[in-house]
A protein has these predicted regions:
Chain B
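Catalytic micro-motifs at enzyme active sites that drive phosphoryl/nucleotidyl and oxygen chemistry
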Residues: 119-128, 173-177, 181-189
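Charge-rich, low-complexity intrinsically disordered and helical linker regions
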Residues: 1-21, 290, 400-404, 450-455
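Residues forming anionic-ligand binding surfaces in small-molecule and nucleic-acid pockets
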Residues: 18, 126-157, 222, 227, ...
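Histidine-centered divalent-metal-coordination microenvironment in nucleic-acid enzymes
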Residues: 135-138, 177, 182-210, 356-358
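SsDNA-processing nucleotidyl-transfer enzymes
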Residues: 24, 28-154, 345-347, 363, ...
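Long, charge-rich alpha-helical interaction segments
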Residues: 219-334
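Modules that initiate DNA replication and primer synthesis
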Residues: 194, 201, 294-455
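Long, well-ordered alpha-helical scaffolding segments within enzyme catalytic domains
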Residues: 156-182
Length: 454, 455
């Protein structure tokens, strides 16, 4: 696969016989534009992160099938089937580069790609599935004719033993060495005879997923070797920075432009903080009110959040001034703090309009002594976190679920569960950004306010 | 060894003969006997041939270091335990055993490198010390059946409960050959209260831990502990063909015949309450209880009573089984609870698990761990297995001639029969097949290198 600068793309000549799911066995000989390199990868990453979220929430297989279908259609679809296929293949190989670089990354990528493959496979019809099995070059023969007749009775017994009252012996069975389907053997879901398991078409997933997983696992090791020995150095000015950024990227909206839901004024701010701020921002806000001061990290995290929430520059200046001057005096405020607030709004210096921090960035920050920024789910002690959650109104039962997620280091899921407990509603998308929390919360609260009497 | 040679060995042997005459009947085992056993009777070269799997150095395709990569462990007197022992060849193994007199010898896996040199290799990366081959093994111990045998408990075993092991051998052996297609299977008496099974096909030796675990789970039916009364739960509308075959060919007949005769599982209130607890319907339980409490004054034998009650139970369940899904196969569940094999899953799941070697002597009983013929396992009697003292006595009275190879018919020594069986029905077919495999993979390798021109 060759990555090129923006040029007309040469039509790809890959004669992939049309299976709907490519197997990523070899990197295809096509040219890829540099922009596509990153864009395709980002789209696929959205799908994989969606899969990850679904699994962490314990979705059952059918729900995962639907989730994968939705995610794929949303991010990877293209009206032109061959373009869609190319995007599929290219994005996978780019992400291999991204995720081969450490054991932890490899493990995540392998799990998600395998799950993605499993559910995409399940969504295919039987003919397509058979074609894919064939693509793997698995030497499994379909059992037919007299051999199948001789086995029919016992195959029916297997089906009945699994809880189906009238045995529908499927049309096709595959004769597979029993070693290749250990999970089907262990649960006695297949007939075994003379070392061969008779796997029904509908059970093919197990077989195929094992092969897929094993292949990707080996490929990642090879890719890693190539990366560390040649590619990383060779591409240090071109692809390497993109690859390194992709594994930590946040993929949601950036909230730099506030929306209709999110205009707040100074008068409302205390009330809104209590009702709609996520825990991290509530804490910072309370500390500002309490201490009339915040250190730099906290000023950045809260300040940008407030901008995203719709606080205008003038109101922001008034807010910070009102608090800080209780401690440091008006002149010092103008000299030392006002400038950086204006800077955040893009009115000073290089005039970049800074974007509010996403959860990922906040979680990775390192608050020190005297700091109050960061993610409470990560950075607070258990006792402090429980106290804070109590003040938000969580019951002790709700708190347990949240603490469980915290123990498993799923900080964003913990925040999502808090959201769900506070508003009594489910948040399927999951919280990825404090401003998202705020917007969702406002949506719910506004929909609950009774219409004004006429 | 000839009689002359035995007598010329000097005082040592004669002193032992005197000792034997004065021995207490319980003294089946002691270190001196063990020394003589290791000196004269332990079949070193047979064990070596087995575990070499044809790599005897005679064929260019042989791996001469194969035997040396096998782990052995010795348990010495006073429970001193030596792991990661390995031997270059049969004679170094023999020397080590004769100088250590281990009370127990365990066989482990074949590793990627000589276990002796394992510290030179890291645990990660490409040059690792890791198991590469190991027989698929099973361990069946009668103590796992304590909740369903009434004649003995703990370490004891008798002619009434040993048949449970016999049935287990039949069920597992049939499955290993019919379902899994294995051909080279060795069953060995564990010396006191159970059996071990060694599956030695090349395919079996190369199985991963995951695959071993899958086979062990395939065999697993009993999921019991003190907390549940219904320890076998057969769901679905029929039995899986493997379970159905085991039930029809072995378990049902055994339960309704021999088991009732030896264990009389319905004859007293304690016993039948246990069975009633397996029926998940209180009404049926009360109905049967009512019938049985009142017939206590019957003049029938215990066995006859049990059979009558079993018939009553079956009839009642047959008419009522549609009442709930958990009653559908309640009759089968009861039969399985009492008769289906109970293997120790942990032994089978990991390649590096050590298992006692055949032809060891059990320190508590003095009995030799002899092979069992799975096709004739009804004939096997654990209480008739030669003990160490019997063997020593036989040597001293000049009755054994250890040239087992010559004069097959006239050799009646106690151990010779077992060794002959080991050779003819297990070792010889195994080695023949190993040699064929080495030959053919060598030919393939040669063929491949002829075709390539890599410089």
């Amino acid at each position: 696969m060759e990555v090129i600068r923006s040029q007309k793309r040469t039509p790809s000549n890959d004669t992939v016989s049309n299976p709907k799911i490519p197997l990523y066995l070899t990197a295809p000989p096509m040219e890829v534009r540099l922009e596509e390199f990153e864009l395709f990868a980002v789209d696929r990453l959205r799908v994989l992160k969606g899969v990850s979220d679904g699994l962490a929430r314990g979705r059952n297989p059918k729900e995962m099938d639907d989730l994968v279908d939705t995610l794929w259609k949303e991010h990877m679809r293209d009206p032109d089937a061959s373009v869609m296929l190319n995007k599929d293949i290219i994005s996978h190989f780019v992400l291999r580069l991204v995720y081969c670089r450490s054991d932890e990354l490899k493990k995540w990528f392998l799990s998600m790609e395998t799950a993605l493959f499993r559910h995409r496979f399940r969504l295919q019809n039987f003919e397509a599935q058979r074609a894919i099995v064939g693509e793997f070059g698995l030497p499994y023969k379909a059992v037919t004719g007299a051999e199948l007749e001789g086995l029919k009775e016992r195959l029916g017994q297997v089906v009945r033993s699994l809880g189906q009252i009238s045995p529908t012996v499927e049309a096709v069975y595959y004769k597979v060495p029993f070693e290749e389907v250990p999970d089907l053997v262990a649960s006695r879901r297949v007939l075994i005879q003379k070392g061969y398991a008779f796997v029904a078409g509908s059970q093919l997933v197990s077989l195929v997923v094992t092969q897929f997983r094993s292949h990707i696992s080996k490929a990642l090791i090879l890719t890693n070797r190539k990366w560390t020995t040649t590619i990383q150095e060779r591409e240090k000015d071109r692809l390497t920075p993109i690859v390194e950024a992709l594994s930590t990227s946040y993929l949601g909206p950036d909230y730099s432009q506030s929306t209709e839901y999110a205009e707040i004024s100074l008068m409302d701010i205390d009330q809104v903080a209590k009702s709609s701020f996520p825990l991290c921002m509530r804490h910072l806000f309370e500390k500002v009110r309490e201490d009339h001061h915040l250190k730099h990290g906290g000023r950045m995290q809260l300040g940008l959040f407030l901008k995203g929430v719709g606080l205008k520059l003038d109101d922001a200046l008034a807010f910070w001034r009102a608090e800080f001057t209780k401690k440091v005096g008006s002149e010092r405020f103008d000299k030392e703090y006002a400038y950086s607030i204006r800077h955040n709004y893009g009115k000073e210096g290089k005039r970049t309009d800074y974007t509010p921090y996403a959860c990922q960035k906040i979680i990775l920050s390192a608050p020190g002594a005297g700091d109050h920024h960061g993610c409470p789910y990560r950075h607070f002690s258990e006792d402090n976190l429980r106290a804070a959650l109590g003040r938000m109104g969580l019951s002790s039962r709700g708190m347990e679920g949240v603490m469980d997620q915290v123990r498993n280091k799923h900080y964003q899921l913990a925040c999502t569960m808090t959201f769900e407990a506070v508003y009594g509603t489910s948040c399927d998308a999951g919280i990825n950004h404090p401003n998202q929390y705020f917007e969702e919360s406002q949506k719910i609260l506004k929909s609950k306010t009774p219409p004004a009497p006429v | 060894m000839t009689r002359e040679e035995i007598e010329s060995r000097g005082d040592e042997t004669m002193m032992d003969a005197a000792q034997i005459k004065n021995q207490k009947p319980e003294e089946f085992f002691n270190v001196n006997y063990l020394r003589i056993y290791y000196g004269n009777l332990f079949p070193y070269s047979d064990i070596h041939k087995w575990l070499s799997y044809g790599h005897d150095g005679k064929h260019p395709g042989c791996d001469e270091y194969y035997f040396g990569r096998r782990e052995f462990s010795f348990t010495l007197e006073n429970d001193v335990y030596l792991r990661y022992k390995s031997f270059k060849n049969a004679s170094s193994m023999e020397d080590a055993i004769k100088s250590n007199f281990p009370y127990k010898i365990d066989i482990g896996a074949v590793y990627s490198v000589d276990p002796d040199k394992r510290h030179a290799y890291s645990q990660t990366g490409t040059n690792v010390f890791t198991p590469v081959e190991r027989e698929l093994v099973f361990d069946i111990d009668i103590t796992d059946y304590d909740d369903v045998r009434y004649c003995c408990s703990g370490a004891d075993v008798c002619s009434k409960c040993w048949p449970l092991i016999t049935v287990a051998i039949k069920v597992i052996h049939t499955s290993l050959t019919e379902d899994f297609g294995f051909k080279h299977i060795l069953w060995v008496f564990s010396g006191r209260r159970g059996v071990h099974c060694w599956v030695c096909d090349p395919k079996a030796r190369r199985m991963t831990n995951e695959q071993r675990s899958a086979v062990a789970e395939y065999f697993r039916v009993y999921k019991g502990n003190e907390n549940n009364a219904r320890k076998v739960a057969l769901m679905g509308y029929s039995l899986h063909p493997f379970l159905a075959r085991s039930y029809v060919d072995y378990l049902k007949g055994f339960f309704e015949g021999e088991l009732q005769a030896t264990q009389s599982i319905f004859s007293t209130k304690d016993k039948y309450e246990k069975i009633l607890a397996m029926i998940s319907d209180e009404d049926i339980q009360s109905e049967l209880r009512g019938k049985w409490e009142n017939s206590a004054r019957s003049s029938l034998s215990e066995e006859a009573i049990s059979l009558v009650r079993w018939e009553q139970l079956k009839n009642t369940l047959q008419s009522k089984k549609h009442k709930a899904p958990t009653l559908r196969m309640c009759v089968e569940e009861i039969v399985f609870t009492f008769t289906y094999p109970r293997i120790d899953l942990e032994v089978s799941k990991q390649m590096n698990h050590l298992l006692k070697a055949p032809f060891c002597v059990h320190p508590k009983t003095g009995r030799v761990c002899v092979p069992i013929d799975p096709n004739n396992c009804d004939e096997f009697d654990p209480l008739a297995v030669p003990t160490l003292s019997q063997l020593i006595e036989e040597i001293n009275s000049g009755g054994s001639r250890m040239d087992v190879d010559d004069d097959e018919d006239s050799d009646t020594s106690l151990l010779a029969k077992s060794i002959k069986f080991f050779r003819s029905s297990f070792l010889e077919p195994l080695l023949k097949s190993c040699k064929e495999e080495i030959e053919s993979s060598y030919k393939t390798k040669i063929g491949k290198s002829k075709d390539s021109f890599s410089w």
